[in-house]
Structure formats: structure tokens, C-alpha cells
UniProtKB/Swiss-Prot annotation:
<comment type="function">
    <text>Catalyzes the phosphorylation of the position 2 hydroxy group of 4-diphosphocytidyl-2C-methyl-D-erythritol.</text>
</comment>
<dbReference type="InterPro" id="IPR006204">
    <property type="entry name" value="GHMP_kinase_N_dom"/>
</dbReference>
<dbReference type="GO" id="GO:0016114">
    <property type="term" value="P:terpenoid biosynthetic process"/>
</dbReference>
<keyword id="KW-0547">Nucleotide-binding</keyword>
<feature type="active site">
    <location>
        <position position="16"/>
    </location>
</feature>
<keyword id="KW-0414">Isoprene biosynthesis</keyword>
<feature type="active site">
    <location>
        <position position="143"/>
    </location>
</feature>
<keyword id="KW-0067">ATP-binding</keyword>
<dbReference type="InterPro" id="IPR004424">
    <property type="entry name" value="IspE"/>
</dbReference>
<dbReference type="Pfam" id="PF08544">
    <property type="entry name" value="GHMP_kinases_C"/>
</dbReference>
<comment type="similarity">
    <text>Belongs to the GHMP kinase family. IspE subfamily.</text>
</comment>
<dbReference type="Pfam" id="PF00288">
    <property type="entry name" value="GHMP_kinases_N"/>
</dbReference>
<feature type="binding site">
    <location>
        <begin position="101"/>
        <end position="111"/>
    </location>
    <ligand>
        <name>ATP</name>
    </ligand>
</feature>
<keyword id="KW-0808">Transferase</keyword>
<dbReference type="InterPro" id="IPR013750">
    <property type="entry name" value="GHMP_kinase_C_dom"/>
</dbReference>
<dbReference type="GO" id="GO:0019288">
    <property type="term" value="P:isopentenyl diphosphate biosynthetic process, methylerythritol 4-phosphate pathway"/>
</dbReference>
<dbReference type="InterPro" id="IPR020568">
    <property type="entry name" value="Ribosomal_Su5_D2-typ_SF"/>
</dbReference>
Length: 312
């Protein structure tokens, strides 16, 4: 194997929240047709990649709760991009510093997969273009493509059809999650499908109308003031009804001073509240941190960021 120009790199792998999650219908391929607005936040994992000379992918992490086997999306992504390179001699030692909670609805695993594609493309001097990386990312999961560019985007289809949302949002965010709770995304979508299937739209015309309505309305008419704003998550009705911890988190967030809106992210169980800016969010966070902990929640304060995966 010829000597590679890069021996070690670090990649920032941020979380996301859903500002809008609407289930339109069921696709022929079994996935759900979605209309979403996804937004990156600065709660991030960090992944170090270092070349090795044994042609193997080795993964370690500071997290004791994370599987480091072949089912880990980092390993899957590394094998995908290695197979594409057709170079069996390529190898990497990977260390994941895990800060994003696992199974939380913040897409930490999807973000890590995207970070692996971007990181190894650089480390191994593969020079794969954006389109190729994007196609690879879509094979790994519905949320993975979003993180390649990130920021704030409309996400349609099963999540792989992306349109940049040129927003000027500067919200501060407080996150709450019960550390003892994780929720199956597959099961949650299945339960939603069973209950609301008669309401599904399958016609292209109606699907396009919902997409266009979201493009036109979104948060464009929102003026930063004391008013509440609408954040939508169709899965919340299922999870909140079956999970007292999520119901409690939403109640606590709804009663925070200066809260503009609150919702569940993805399929949960993490819930979030939006504030006018990070300074207000920090102040509210400091005032209520003990209360969050006393009620059994881990809590974070974050700001929105305009990028996804970042090479450091």
C-alpha cells in the first residue's frame, strides 16, 4: 500500500432535533413518506481516525453502553467505504468520544455513520465526491444523508430528499432525557401506522401539497417575540401516551419561563424546549438544572449550528 498523506484526523459529529416531523404515508418499499425539518445542534460526538497497517477496522469508545461490533453504524460505514475503494489493505483505528445519548431520538448513530464516511474519505485519500458520499450515506440509514451537509434542512421521502432551509434561527435549546429509557424507532412507527393508517395520503398530488405547504410556511412567519411557535411531531402522540417519562419531560419543559415551544425529537425519548437565544436558554437551564435532575432527567443546553459533519 502506498503511503497515505494523512495519518490521523478528528471529526465533529453533531446531534439533530426535529423542528417538524410529519408522516404522510407508507411507501411501497416499506418506509414511511415523511415531511420534516431537521436542525443540527452543537451537542456533538468526536471521532478520531488513525491509519493502521493491518487492514482492519478497530473501534473503541469511552461509552460502556455502546456496541462496538459489526452492528455499529461506524463499522458498517467504514466497511462500505472500504469496499468501494477496492483496497483491502486499508485499515483504521477509530476512537469515538460519545457525548450524544444513545437511543435518544437525536440520531447520534446516524451522525457517526456520516462522520465515518467523511473522515475515512479524507484519511484514506479516496477523493470521493459529494454525490458518491451521499449515495453511500443513504444506504446506511434514512437520517444519515442529512448530516453530510447538515445545518437546517427540509427532509422528504424517507429522509434522503434534502433541501437547504435558509433560516436565521438563533434559538437556544434545552434537552431532557431519562437516562434509563430508550425507545424503538421501528416499533413507534409501526404503532403509528396501525392507528393512523386510514389517514395516510398515498397520492402524489397530496404528498406534493404537504411538501409545498411546509416549504412556504415552515417557520418563515415566525417573529422572535414572546409568542409560542408550532413544532410538530406526529410520533409524539404515540410515545407520550405510552411513556410517563416523556409525558413528564414535556410537562416540565412547557412550564419553563420564556419557553417558545417544546416537543419530542424523532421517536424520543429526548424532549426539547426552544428559547429566543442561547443566553436565555442558559439562564433558564441554570435556574432549573437541579429540578431536572431531581425528576430523574439528564439535561443539556445547546445552540443551533449551520453545519453537519466537520473535519477538525
Amino acid at each position: 500500500m502506498s503511503k497515505l498523506s494523512t495519518t490521523k484526523i478528528c471529526v465533529k459529529s453533531p446531534a439533530k432535533i426535529n423542528l417538524h416531523l410529519e408522516i404522510i404515508g407508507k411507501r411501497k418499499d416499506g418506509y414511511h413518506e415523511l415531511a420534516m425539518i431537521m436542525q443540527n445542534i452543537d451537542l456533538s460526538d468526536y471521532i478520531e481516525f488513525e491509519n493502521n497497517q493491518i487492514g482492519e477496522i478497530k473501534l473503541k469508545s469511552n461509552s460502556k453502553d455502546l456496541s462496538l461490533d459489526e452492528d455499529n453504524l461506524i463499522i458498517k460505514a467504514a466497511n462500505y467505504i472500504k469496499d468501494m475503494s477496492k483496497n483491502k489493505e486499508l485499515g483504521a483505528n477509530i476512537f469515538l468520544k460519545k457525548n450524544i445519548p444513545i437511543g435518544a431520538g437525536l440520531a447520534g448513530g446516524s451522525s457517526n455513520a456520516a462522520a465515518t464516511l467523511v473522515g475515512l474519505n479524507k484519511l484514506w485519500d479516496l477523493d470521493l465526491d459529494y454525490e458518491t458520499i451521499f449515495i453511500l450515506s443513504a444506504k446506511l440509514g434514512s437520517d444519515v444523508p442529512f448530516f453530510i451537509e447538515g445545518g437546517c434542512q427540509f427532509c422528504f421521502g424517507r429522509g434522503e430528499i434534502l433541501e437547504k432551509y435558509s433560516s436565521n434561527f438563533d434559538f437556544g435549546v434545552i434537552l431532557l432525557k431519562n437516562p434509563n429509557i430508550s425507545i424503538s424507532t421501528v416499533d413507534t412507527y409501526k404503532k403509528y401506522s396501525q392507528e393512523f393508517c386510514p389517514k395516510y395520503f398515498t397520492e402524489t398530488e397530496k404528498t406534493n401539497k404537504i411538501r409545498n405547504d411546509l416549504r412556504v410556511n415552515g417557520f418563515n412567519d415566525f417573529k422572535l417575540s414572546e409568542q409560542r411557535i408550532n413544532v410538530k411531531n406526529d410520533l409524539q402522540v404515540i410515545v407520550e401516551r405510552e411513556n410517563n417519562s416523556v409525558k413528564k419531560a414535556l410537562y416540565l419543559l412547557s412550564n419553563l419561563q420564556n419557553c417558545l415551544s417544546y416537543s419530542m425529537s424523532g421517536s424520543g425519548p429526548t424532549c426539547f424546549a426552544l428559547f429566543k437565544d442561547i443566553n436565555i436558554a442558559n439562564e433558564v437551564f441554570e435556574q432549573n438544572y437541579k429540578m431536572f435532575n431531581n425528576n430523574g432527567f439528564e439535561a443539556w443546553v445547546c445552540k443551533l449550528i449551520n453545519s453537519g459533519i466537520t473535519l477538525l
